[in-house]
From Swiss-Prot:
Keywords: Acetylation, Actin-binding, Cytoplasm, Cytoskeleton, Phosphoprotein. This is Phostensin. Residues 15-33, 110-160, 173-197, 234-245, 271-289, 348-358 have a biased composition (Basic and acidic residues). The modification N6-acetyllysine is found at residue 462. Residues 585-594 have a biased composition (Acidic residues). GO terms for cellular component: cytoplasm; cytoskeleton. It comes from Sus scrofa (Pig). The gene is PPP1R18. InterPro entries: Phostensin/Taperin_N_dom, Phostensin/Taperin_PP1-bd_dom, PPP1R18/Tprn. Residues 96-109, 308-319, 485-505 have a biased composition (Low complexity). It is found in: Cytoplasm, Cytoskeleton. Interacts with Protein phosphatase 1 (PP1). May target protein phosphatase 1 to F-actin cytoskeleton. Residues 429-451, 572-583 have a biased composition (Pro residues).
Length: 618
């Protein structure tokens, strides 16, 4: 048997030593971890899982830390203060890495698509033409490499500084789009809104002239929300509209050659491979949307978002040419990037301007118009019908709510159409009261606006978000009239309390009826009623007037002061002034009931005999 060479023996010995050292370290680490509190152990393990092991190290057992020199890392972790999650530097690092990876992937995909779609000669010529003042010194490739060297923010600002003509050239637009993190997309859309005014050549057909109105109305962030809701086929068709529209340039002289490029790219995109690329990209976008969405955009209820998705898909599916809404692009971009801040079924007041209501009502109408033909054309009739069904209720509600002229027919809607619609929006602006009024399902507290008593009665009672009577804020329904009652309220002591409580004023309801007065546990609190002297603020503890079950069944009357004082007998002359002479005959009639009551009132009213006052004098 051949002897093992010397170098191999040395290698084996060194490996054994290393393994023994690693085992010893792991053992020490395990002991340390077992003595550590659970939260600290969890922190260490999470951090190790995030960082991952470098390839040269042997993988340690699951309960241990990294092999290699662990001491500096460990001390840093153990001394670290546990603050809010979004400030944790490990989590921030992880987020940055994820964003960088996503941006790289999307850049690669975008560049592949561009290479597949573009005709190099045309595109280079157009780019040279787009910025003649500045770009003479470099070829497109040099410019691209220089832009890649810049950080995304610098590149974006530099492009913004150059001006409108340059930035709507296709390649910078798309590369800027995909270099941004989703959070930056919104402010970009608002800043670009002024620069992106599409000038259309008079020679173009209305179909071509209407096409640019579509990409503006979906600011990038909203476009992502929409695409995450659409079925894959829908998003595929929408990509058609968007990628074409990204190629539009404001130069009216070049519209003819653009139409050629557009048709060519449409034809290519309809082929199978390109559609697969688009679908993959849509999938990636869906993954990226969910973490990247801004809370502002999700204020609407899910129903609202699906409605947006349905509306924009039906408008964007390859037939934006029929879409009659070329309103001012910049303003619409700003408005839509804020998100529609209204929900369909809640009773909150909508934050909408009249112009918003106009565009919204026009959008659903055009969406309804186009759902049928588009579904048939794209071969996805069922999906579109389902969307239309889900959309039906919100649409009808919207159209009833917004009293807006229906959009222009597609034939007239050229550039003149946009002017007319801007004028309509201007006319709509002065009376904001009609669209802003909330829908009927959430009525406020049921009182006429001019009735001060009822407004005082329902003070602090908020109308709930749904249909129904207002909720009461406390446990009891407190009657609180501060004005003097009308003269009809001065009644004889024999008048039952229910009649007192339901005295009608001159056409207005002054008191709640007997059904509205809530008696809880046998106690009724009427502040400032004819039964109680003194202000309710001072005596609110003493104003609980007690009933017994038998007395409630038989009568609603209270003993007069004179009878109670005769029974107690401390000062018989005091009640003569307040108690009227009319009280005497009634007392004689009702003696049996009063005897019943007096037995029960002896304990309760012995100390506070003067609280009950039947004269109703204010």
């Amino acid at each position: 048997m051949a002897t093992i060479p010397d170098w191999k023996l040395q290698l084996l010995a060194r490996r054994r030593q290393e393994e023994a050292a690693v085992r010893g370290r792991e053992k020490a680490e395990r002991e340390r971890l077992s003595q550590m509190p659970a939260w600290k152990r969890g922190l260490l393990e999470r951090r190790r899982a995030k960082l991952g092991l470098s390839p040269g190290e042997p993988s340690p057992a699951p309960g241990t830390t990294e092999a290699g020199p662990p001491d500096p890392d460990k001390s840093a972790v153990l001394l670290e203060a546990i603050g809010p999650v979004h400030q944790n530097r490990f989590i921030r690092q992880e987020r940055q890495q994820q964003q960088q990876q996503q941006q790289q992937q999307q850049q690669q995909q975008r560049s592949e698509e561009l290479l597949a779609e573009r005709r190099p000669g045309l595109l280079e010529a157009r780019e040279w033409r787009s910025s003649p003042g500045e770009m003479r010194d470099q070829s497109p490739k040099e410019r691209e490499s220089r832009e890649e060297r810049l950080s995304p923010r610098e590149a974006r600002e530099r492009r913004l500084g150059i001006g409108g003509a340059r930035e709507s050239s296709p390649r910078p637009l798309e590369s800027r789009d995909w270099r941004q993190s989703p959070g930056e997309a919104g402010d970009r859309s608002s800043r670009l809104s002024e620069v992106r005014k599409w000038r259309l050549s008079p020679g173009e057909t209305p179909e071509r002239s209407l096409r640019p109105a579509e990409p503006q109305e979906q600011s990038p962030r909203r476009k992502e929300v929409v695409e995450s809701r659409l079925s894959p086929a829908d998003s595929d068709h929408e990509k058609l509209g968007l990628t074409d529209a990204h190629k539009r340039r404001p130069d009216s002289g070049e519209s003819q050659e653009q139409s050629l490029v557009l048709e060519a790219s449409e034809w290519r995109l309809s082929s199978g491979e390109e559609r697969k690329d688009c679908l993959e990209e849509c999938g990636r976008k869906e993954e990226r949307t969910l973490p990247g969405m801004v809370p502002e955009d999700i204020t609407g209820s899910p129903e609202t978002l699906t409605m947006e998705a349905a509306g924009s898909s039906s408008g964007g599916v390859e037939a934006a040419d029929q879409r009659p809404i070329p309103v001012e692009d910049g303003e619409r971009d700003l408005r839509l990037s804020e998100g529609w801040k209204w929900t369909l079924n809640s009773g909150k007041v909508r934050d909408r301007t009249p112009r918003d209501t106009e565009t919204q009502s026009q959008k659903p109408e055009s969406a309804e118009k186009h759902l049928g033909p588009l579904g048939a054309e794209a071969g996805e009739g069922e999906a579109e019908k389902e969307e239309a069904g889900a959309q039906g209720r919100p649409l009808s509600a919207l159209q009833n709510r917004c009293s807006v002229p229906s959009p222009l027919p597609p034939e007239d809607a050229g550039t003149g159409g946009s002017r007319q619609q801007e004028e309509e929006a201007g006319e709509l602006r002065p009376p904001p009261a009609a669209p802003l009024s909330p829908p009927p399902p959430a009525p406020p507290a049921p009182q006429p606006p001019g009735d001060p008593l009822m407004s005082r009665l329902f003070y602090g009672v908020k109308a709930g978000p749904g249909v129904g009577a207002p909720r009461r804020s406390g446990h009891t329904f407190t009657v609180n009239p501060r004005r003097s009652a009308p003269p009809a309220a001065a009644a004889t002591p024999a008048t039952p309390a229910t009649a007192d409580a339901a005295v009608p004023g001159a056409g207005k309801k002054r008191y709640p009826t007997a059904e509205e007065i809530l008696v809880l546990g046998g106690y009724l609190r009427l502040s400032r009623s004819c039964l109680a002297k003194g202000s309710p603020e001072r005596h609110h503890k003493q104003l609980k007037i007690s009933f017994s079950e038998t007395a409630l069944e038989t009568t609603y009357q209270y003993p007069s002061e004179s009878s109670v004082l005769e029974e107690l007998g401390p000062e018989p002359e005091a009640p003569s002034a307040p108690s009227p002479p009319a009280a005497q005959p009634d007392d004689e009639e009702d003696e049996e009931e009063l005897l019943l009551l007096q037995r029960e009132l002896q304990g309760g009213l012995r100390t506070k005999a003067l609280i009950v006052d039947e004269s109703c004098r204010r």
